[in-house]
Amino acid sequence: MHACSIRDLKKEYVLKSETVRALRGVSFDVPEGDYVAIMGPSGSGKSTLLNLLGCLDQPSGGELLLGKDNVATMTDDQLAEIRSRRIGFVFQSYNLIQQLTVVENIQVPLYYQGKLGAKERKRCVDLAARVGLQDRLSHRPTQLSGGQQQRVAIARSLVNDPYFILADEATGNLDSKTTAEILSLFNELNAEGRTIIMVTHEDEVAERAKRIIRLRDGLLQSDRLNSPESRQAAAERALALIPDPQDDEEQTPTPIPVEA
C-alpha cells in the first residue's frame, strides 16, 4: 500500500489578472516505509506541494491519495480531520506551546480529539522515551535545547500513528551536531517502518533519505534512489563536520601567571 499517491497533480493561483501555474502535472508514489526528500529551487513548486501533502490546500486538478483517502474531493472539514489524525507535522521552528510540558505538547493532537485518558498519556510518555526525552517529561520548551524541542515535535508527530511524517526543513535551525542526531532519529524511525517525507534545501540532508525527488518550474525534474552506500557516506561526512570538544580544550590558552 502507498502512504500517498500523486497523479497529474496541478495547482494554479490567480494573482490579479495573471494565472500562476505552481504545479503543472506532477506524478509519483510514496510506498509505506519509504523515506523521501523533496528538493527544488525557489519557484519550483516545492512549497505548494508541501501544502497539498499537508492538506492545507486543495489541488486545481489531478489526484492526491493519502492512504485510501482522495484529498482532491474533500471538504474543508474533512481536510482538517485528515490533518489532525493522519499526518504528522515536524516544522523548522518546532511549534511547541511554551506553557505546556514535554508530555503535554506531545499530547496536543489527542487533546483536540478529546482523548485525555491514562492510556493516551502513557502513549505520550512512551513516545517521549522513544525520542530520548524520558528524563525531561515535565520540562517546558524554554528549558530545552533546540534539538530537544525538535525531538518533542517528532514525538508529537507520531502520536496519531500517521500515514507519514511530513518534515519541513526540520533541521534548518539546528547546528551540525544536533542535525546529525535528528537525522539519525529519522533513520531509526524509518527502519521501524515509519514513512517520512522531508522537504529540504540542503543536499547533505537529502542524501540521508532513501530517495530524492527534485522539482523545477512546477514539474518533476528527477526522482532517484540513494544507495545504502551513498546514505552511509553522507552520514559519515556529517559526523566529520561535527567539532571535537577536545579541540576546544586543546586551544584553550594557558593562563599567564601574575607576579605578586
Feature locations, PLM:
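ABC family nucleotide-binding domain
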Residues: 2-209, 215
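Long, low-complexity, intrinsically disordered segments
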Residues: 252-260
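Conserved beta-strand-loop-alpha-helix hinge in the C-terminal portion
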Residues: 219-246
